[in-house]
């Protein structure tokens, strides 16, 4: 886990100086796990947990920890992605895959430039007003807000066999995103 090795390398000098800021670049899916992205979501949840626990642990040493949580960013990452080229229409997970595709399509409509992530990092490390979590982009902010409003059991229950209309209605209610328009 590269983040842990990096933190282990810099933390002793930050502690001795009684200052510093560790920046973890996580993801909006580190706040609310998305189906069909389990390994990615799990790795980002782990980094979220690391940041939260470490922030508590090193606060007394004057060291800040921030988790920067981008949503969809305007890059070419999906151009050659296997996920975009392989879509098994006979899969029993097809409804979930289709809906998750709509979530991403919605995110692409509101994607932000990579520079916005850099600006957020700069703000997070220079502001006097400390916050642990820094969502980047409207989709990330929506997931951040929803994570604090939706019970985990309600999110899980959205995996039930709902009609697209029911699912879209619930999704819009929780996240403010109308998937029927994607």
Regions found by a protein language model. Name each.
Residues 7, 43:
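Active-site helix of classical SDR
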Residues 32, 53-64:
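Active-site-adjacent segment of SDR/Rossmann-fold oxidoreductases
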Residues 27:
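Residue(s) in the substrate-gating loop at a strand-loop-helix junction
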Residues 32-38:
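Active-site loop immediately N-terminal to the catalytic Tyr-X3-Lys motif
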Residues 59, 63-108:
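C-terminal beta-strand-loop-alpha-helix "lid" module of Rossmann-like NAD(P)-dependent dehydrogenases
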Residues 1-2, 17-20, 45:
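Conserved internal alpha-helix in NAD(P)-dependent oxidoreductase domains
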Residues 108-146:
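Core catalytic loop region at the nicotinamide-binding pocket of NAD(P)H-dependent oxidoreductases
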Residues 9-18:
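A short helix-coil junction within the Rossmann-fold of NAD(P)-dependent oxidoreductases
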């Amino acid at each position: 886990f590269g983040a842990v090795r990096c933190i282990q390398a810099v933390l002793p000098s930050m502690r001795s100086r009684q200052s510093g800021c560790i920046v973890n670049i996580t993801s909006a899916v580190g706040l609310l796990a998305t189906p069909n992205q389990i390994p990615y979501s799990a790795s980002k949840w782990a980094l979220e947990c690391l940041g939260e626990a470490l922030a508590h642990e090193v606060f007394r040493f004057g060291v800040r920890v921030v988790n920067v949580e981008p949503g969809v960013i305007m890059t070419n990452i999906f151009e050659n992605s296997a996920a975009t080229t392989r879509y098994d229409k006979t899969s029993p997970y097809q409804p979930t895959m289709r809906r998750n595709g709509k979530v991403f399509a919605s995110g692409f409509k509101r994607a932000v430039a990579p520079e916005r992530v850099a600006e957020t990092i700069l703000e997070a490390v220079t502001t006097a007003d400390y916050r642990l979590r820094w969502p980047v982009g409207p989709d990330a902010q929506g997931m951040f807000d929803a994570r604090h409003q939706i019970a985990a059991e309600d999110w899980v229950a959205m995996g039930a066999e709902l009609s697209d209309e029911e699912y879209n209605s619930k999704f819009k209610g929780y996240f403010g995103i109308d998937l029927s328009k994607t």
